[in-house]
């Protein structure tokens, strides 16, 4: 009995459906395998990223702990500074009468001095012994005894007319000038001191003009008076020069010290103009006044350093000056050293790429231009390993078309001969094709560099 045409057609349809179903199942299985391979590659990349980010997280945590510790230390040092300020008499007493307000022109410099004096308590002290307070107290007593007849700005009272001099003597008798307290950081050796002299011409009926003349840094122990301190002959029109010295000490700890003129000193009263015949004693007292002023400036400005330390600093500075050939070369060296200390990621990649080029010179099918397509056929890996182990395999027998074989050979030889772990799988390189991930290739090449350079 022959089958009907409908039965034959149904049988043909079932066979076609079976073939389609088998092909579809094969495609689904291949897709699942590709997805699993991709998932494994992603997991490995994530694990590598976490491994690389681990030291960074630990470093950030350590920096946070250091920041908290430094904040606590800064608070503790601030409290110590406040206690030292109260102990040495830096802060004015509550019952101290404030000086009466002066004119607008004459009150400009005291306001600046007060601002500097209020900001000088921001310095930091470290490693101070309790005996410093006693030394400061004794030093203040000696200064108070020696400077009883000298004003704070370094001027001695002139023998002027009767009305002007009587007012100055009365104000100084009622409230004697207090010596300026010396900062504790001045006792520390080898700290550069810069003295800045502000000279303001006042009491002449015109707008005051202030000039700043910075003196050279007093490091060794010598002091050169600024041109503003030169002794000028007496002139009929009396002018009063008020100088405020600002010492800027660069400390080794957390800040800088700025000591200004005390605001609690009595204001100066200038005698009115008088004919030249009434001022002959001032001409004889001008040299002594200039000498005393320079001695006062030298005693308040220079750091206390021993002779050996001063000679050592002088010789070191002289050797540095003679060693350098010029300012341009010194600046160029400094610029190169600063730029070399902070290397970027691109420069590291370029250095590693140049090293790989130097090791693979003369090898066929190797042209290293980047960390992606130049390594896609595996020949670069094989050439790099073969340059260190030429007897391990025959490089000339390799072909760029056999990518999987090249990857397997290079990774296996590097793992067996150089003990370099296989950070990249052959399947991953095959899946990524002609443009593999630059970070994966760079990471593995960096590992090869760390292991192969031992055999150089």
From Swiss-Prot:
Basic and acidic residues composition-biased segments: 131-140
Residue stretches of biased makeup (Pro residues): 268-279
Phosphoserine modified-residue sites: 98, 126, 131, 250, 252, 265, 274, 339
PROSITE patterns: CH
Coiled-coil regions, chain positions: 24-88
Boundaries of every Calponin-homology (CH) domain copy: 346-453
Modified residues (Phosphothreonine): 96, 270
Compositional bias per record (Low complexity), positions renumbered to this chain: 242-251
Superkingdom, taxonomy of origin: Eukaryota
Keyword terms, alphabetized: Coiled coil, Phosphoprotein
Pfam families: CH
InterPro entries attached to this UniProt entry: CH_dom, CH_dom_sf, F-actin_Monoox_Mical
PANTHER family xrefs: CALPONIN HOMOLOGY DOMAIN-CONTAINING PROTEIN DDB_G0272472-RELATED (PTHR23167), SMOOTHELIN-LIKE PROTEIN 2 (PTHR23167:SF37)
Family: Belongs to the smoothelin family.
Protein name per UniProt: Smoothelin-like protein 2
Biological source species: Mus musculus (Mouse)
């Amino acid at each position: 009995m022959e089958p009907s045409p409908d039965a034959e057609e149904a049988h043909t349809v079932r066979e076609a459906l079976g073939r389609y179903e088998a092909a579809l199942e094969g495609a689904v299985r291949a897709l699942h395998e590709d997805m699993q391979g991709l998932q494994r590659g992603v997991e490995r990349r994530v694990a590598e990223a976490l491994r690389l980010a681990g030291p960074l997280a630990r470093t950030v945590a350590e920096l946070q702990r250091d920041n908290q510790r430094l904040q606590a230390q800064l608070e503790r040092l601030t409290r110590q500074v406040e206690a030292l300020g109260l102990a040495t008499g830096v802060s004015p007493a509550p019952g101290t009468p404030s000086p009466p307000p002066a004119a607008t022109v004459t009150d400009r410099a005291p306001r600046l001095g007060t601002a500097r004096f209020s900001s000088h308590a921001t310095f930091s002290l470290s490693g101070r012994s309790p005996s410093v307070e006693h030394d400061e107290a004794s030093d203040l007593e000696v200064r108070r005894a020696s400077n009883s007849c000298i004003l704070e700005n370094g001027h001695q009272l002139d023998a002027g007319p009767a009305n002007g001099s009587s007012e100055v003597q009365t104000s100084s008798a009622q409230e004697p000038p207090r010596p300026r307290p010396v900062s504790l950081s001045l006792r520390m050796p080898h700290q550069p001191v810069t003295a800045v002299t502000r000279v303001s011409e006042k009491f002449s009926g015109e707008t005051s003009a202030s000039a700043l003349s910075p003196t050279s840094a007093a490091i060794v122990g010598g002091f050169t008076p600024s041109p503003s301190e030169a002794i000028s002959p007496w002139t009929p029109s009396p002018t009063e020069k008020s100088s405020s010295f600002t010492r800027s000490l660069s400390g080794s700890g957390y800040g800088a010290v700025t000591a200004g003129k005390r605001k609690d000193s009595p204001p100066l009263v200038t005698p009115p103009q008088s004919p030249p015949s009434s001022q002959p004693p001032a001409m004889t007292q001008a040299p002594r006044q200039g000498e005393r002023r320079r001695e006062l400036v030298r005693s308040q400005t220079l750091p206390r350093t021993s002779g050996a330390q001063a000679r050592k600093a002088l010789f070191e500075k002289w050797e540095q000056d003679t060693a350098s050939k010029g300012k341009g070369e010194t600046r160029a060296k400094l610029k190169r050293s600063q730029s070399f200390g902070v290397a970027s990621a691109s420069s590291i990649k370029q250095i590693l790429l140049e090293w790989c080029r130097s090791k693979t010179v003369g090898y066929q099918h190797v042209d290293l231009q980047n960390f992606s397509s130049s390594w896609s056929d595996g020949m670069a890996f094989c050439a790099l390993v073969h340059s260190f182990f030429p007897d391990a395999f025959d490089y000339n027998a390799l072909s760029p078309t056999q990518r999987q074989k090249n990857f397997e050979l290079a990774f296996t030889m590097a793992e067996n001969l150089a003990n370099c772990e296989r950070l990249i799988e052959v399947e991953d390189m095959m899946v990524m094709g002609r443009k593999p991930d630059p970070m994966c290739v760079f990471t593995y090449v960096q590992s090869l560099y760390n292991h192969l350079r031992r055999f150089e």
